[in-house]
Structures are given as C-alpha cells and as structure tokens.
A protein has these predicted regions:
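Gram-negative (and chloroplast) outer-membrane scaffold detector with strong preference
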Residues: 22-24, 28, 32, 40-42, ...
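Predominantly the C-terminal beta-signal and adjacent terminal strand-loop region
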Residues: 77, 81-88, 156, 160-207
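A charged, solvent-exposed segment within the mature domains of Sec-exported extracytoplasmic proteins
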Residues: 127-129, 138-175
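Cleavable N-terminal export/targeting peptides
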Residues: 1-29
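Outer-membrane beta-barrel translocator domains and adjoining extracellular loop/strand segments
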Residues: 46-51, 86-93, 142-149, 186-191
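Short glycine/proline- and aromatic-enriched beta-strand/turn motifs that initiate or cap beta-hairpins
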Residues: 20-61, 181
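Hydrophobic, lipid-facing positions within transmembrane beta-strands of outer-membrane proteins
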Residues: 34, 56-62, 112-116, 128, ...
C-alpha cells in the first residue's frame, strides 16, 4: 500500500504546483466535453478467504464532463473493469506476468461500472481536478473454476466510493484514483464478508 500511495502523493504535489501558474485563457473549458480512457487497475478483495495482497488488471471507459462553473463540474462515467482473485505482494511476480508469459486464472471477474463524479478544480486553472463520487458495478462474467463451486461465488451488484485527482490538458488527461467497496460481494453460503479495494491509474483523450 505504501508503494502505491507514494506515487499518488507525489503526483498530487506536482499537479498542485502546476496549477499555481498564471491563469491562461486556454485554461477555460467548454461546458460539455467527451472523454475516453484506459489504464491499470490494481485491486484486492478483503476477507478471511483472501490474502491481503494486490493483483493487476486493466480498465477501459468513457465519460461526459459537464463543467457547470469554473470550479465545479459533473462527470458521469461508464467503465469496463477486469479483476482477478490471484494475488501477490511480490512485484517480481507482476513483472513476470507482464513480460514473461505468466498468467492469472484462478478467478477472473469482468465488471461494467457506472460512476457519478463531482469535479472540483484546484488552483486558478481548470487543469487539476479533485474527483469524488459513488459507483455501481454489475458483474458481467465470473470464472472461478478453481473454487470447485457450481453456484455464483460473487454477488452480481456492488456499490463503491471513488476519490482521486486528474490533470486535464487541452486534449489529453491523466490521473489516479482510489476505489473502496461499500457492499459485501460474497455470494457463497459462508458468513465471511468480502469487500473490494482498488487503485486505478489512467490516461486518455478529452474532446
């Protein structure tokens, strides 16, 4: 967690410093903007049935920006997010999976997630945005054959909360956010509570 938190804090510091530059007319955004993004999803599931470790996957999505004032805006989003239940805290295993043909197959989950974010502009420009809001996810596909169960292991619906920061350039954007699950996603008969957490790092274009 400390490894993931440090880059986010450094990014926030750099973005805030960037936002303190002299105001430029090009910083003024139009009321309506459309965006597309993709990036890395680092997630874990908390519960006695899971190790307190992370795994990596990906997320793809699109959003609409409604810039109501110079400081406040709304950003509805729809994202396709993939997660897996094989987890590791050894970064060398992640490198092996990325570059040397390793795999994660124990429990793959595909979600379609809908978020409603409040954008709060930081500093004199509209470049740096603090993002906060709720999210609802629908489980589209579940592959958990290693658990030897014929029933649904994970619940179909999940509610979560998001918080993060985004740097909005004229055409491109990048950012990071933290997601915490608010509901129990355990769909089995045992009483163990499962809640998800994730760090997301993304880049994209804004039209």
């Amino acid at each position: 967690m400390k490894i993931l938190l440090l880059p986010l804090l450094l990014s926030a510091f750099c973005l805030n410093a960037y936002s303190q530059k002299k105001k430029d007319p090009s910083d003024i955004e139009s009321f309506f903007r459309l965006g597309f993004k993709g990036g890395l999803n680092l997630n874990k599931i908390e519960g006695k049935s899971f190790k307190d470790e992370f795994n990596y996957n990906y997320a793809l999505g699109g959003f609409v920006q409604l810039n109501i004032t110079r400081k406040l805006g709304l950003q509805p989003e729809i994202n396709f997010v993939q997660t897996t239940a094989e987890q590791t805290n050894d970064i060398t295993v992640v490198y092996d999976d990325l570059f040397f043909g390793g795999n994660q197959k124990k429990a793959k989950l595909d979600y379609l997630k809908f978020a409603g974010l409040l954008n709060i502009d930081i500093g004199p420009s509209q470049r740096v945005k603090l993002q906060l809001g709720p999210q609802w996810g629908r489980l589209l596909n579940e592959t958990a054959d290693s658990l030897n169960s014929s029933q649904d292991v994970f619940k179909k619906n999940e509610f979560s909360a998001l918080g993060g920061i985004m740097l909005q350039l004229p055409l491109f954007h990048l950012g990071a956010r933290y997601e915490i699950g608010l509901t129990d996603v355990n769909g089995t008969d045992n009483n163990d509570k499962w809640r998800s957490q994730a760090w997301q790092f993304f880049v994209g274009i804004t039209l």
